[in-house]
Amino acid sequence: MSEVDKAHLAAINKDVQANDTLFGKIIRKEIPAKIIFEDDEALAFHDVSPQAPIHFLVIPKRRIDMLENAVDSDAALIGKLMVTASKVAKQLGMANGYRVVVNNGKDGAQSVFHLHLHVLGGRQLQWPPG
């Protein structure tokens, strides 16, 4: 199943995900993940289906379903996610650069309705991405 197909299916089942997501289970340690960083507010872990030599996700522990639904009071937490992405990228040796992506909604190919940053690098990335 393609990532776009997964996103379309997730959008249909978004109300089901409202109670729990894959990322909620990772936060609660109910399913394994290769965790790189964790504190009280954020978690970073390797993507299970990497799209680049280095591909990790950064998520807030407090669930925001999608960027579109973020409110002013979420600003500090979203900023924290960006800073965490930068710190982890440095830790993983991505000094030559990397890309940060947020998929938002069905057309943005969001497949898990828990805000997350994709951080991709480890090679020369192309533009436009598609």
UniProtKB/Swiss-Prot annotation:
It holds the Pfam family HIT. The gene is hint-1. One of its GO terms (biological process) is purine ribonucleotide catabolic process. Residues 22-130 form the HIT domain. GO terms for cellular component: cytoplasm; nucleus. It comes from Caenorhabditis elegans. This is Histidine triad nucleotide-binding protein 1. Signal peptide: none annotated. GO terms for molecular function: hydrolase activity. PANTHER family: HISTIDINE TRIAD HIT PROTEIN (PTHR23089). InterPro entries: Histidine_triad_CS, Histidine_triad_HIT, HIT-like, HIT-like_sf. A motif (Histidine triad motif) lies at residues 114-118.
